[in-house]
């Protein structure tokens, strides 16, 4: 007798690959429950931002009221607030980290000014300039220009004043140059005015002026016949002619004789 072997029929409840149908059902449900990305409208974002500006952690009642107002679920509103708080913290952290870094490049771009070691401090320079200005002002009040010009070499009478001597010493200390006894730099800054020589040249010019003045006065007196001419030899002084123009009479005896003859 021959026997035929038939394979067993596949039943619907048989397992396939050691996986039951319940496993597929659970996975399908999990995949189906995954949420999609929500796209908010402009009006919804404005309402959410307004509430976030008031409080970062709204309570459940506020979230439900807001969800009903903008036509969303309370879960969507809660997720939006969580994401918004995370974004706000990230922005604040980035701003705090950027502040020290922004100051350092500024310090590198603008280094501190290099000051010469031999130069005085800025405070001393300002003080010296102020003292020089005060000395010049006091000099202008005490001495002042005597005419339309103010020479740089002043007479000896002005050099003897205490104020002018103090100003000269201060100017010499500022400029650092040697000063002679008579030729000094102009403390008033009148370099455009005519300058004069030293004491010897000034004395010679004064003597020349006096000599010319004396000669002029002598010439005036000679023209008025008040003094004799310097070129003529010494002799009797000539008397001036009478105002009526008549000749001078020689003696009283001749006058008497002429009068007798005329009679």
Swiss-Prot record:
Biased composition range(s): Pro residues: 110-123
SUPFAM superfamilies in alphabetical order: Homeodomain-like
Location of the DNA-binding region in this protein: 33-92
Location relative to the cell: Nucleus
Gene Ontology biological-process annotations: axon guidance; detection of chemical stimulus; detection of temperature stimulus; dorsal spinal cord development; neuron migration; regulation of transcription by RNA polymerase II; sensory perception of mechanical stimulus; trigeminal nerve development
Description of how the protein assembles with itself and partners: Interacts with RGMB.
Entry function: Transcription factor required for the formation of correct projections from nociceptive sensory neurons to the dorsal horn of the spinal cord and normal perception of pain.
Name listed for the protein in its UniProt record: Dorsal root ganglia homeobox protein
Source organism per UniProt: Homo sapiens
